[in-house]
From Swiss-Prot:
Annotated protein name in UniProt: Protein alpha-2
Amino acid sequence: MFGYMEISVRVEIGKQNSRIHKLELWKLMEEGLHTLMKEEKLDIMLKEEANFGFCRWLNTRGNWLYLEDMRKPILIEFQNFFNCLNYPSRVYKLTVQNNDYKLGSIRDLRIKLFFF
């Protein structure tokens, strides 16, 4: 089975020079993915694999991301899970509001998980 994660970010214009701190982005993604795994009863292995792919994407950048870095959704592909066959082919969606991590200018973060 194959899947991918799409992360879309909405920012508050003018705040922190419209920059996003990678720690802020990672914490929101981690929080959202954890909630999604719990609500949809998806396996913890998926969370770890998707998080690893996301961290690898973040490590290719500096500490700050700018609006031009975030114009397109972040796409992370993953495959070869131990028990992927238990998941139906569908799309899982979640929006995470940024209430706690105010390092940059993220308003909210949308996560979509696709399984095929």
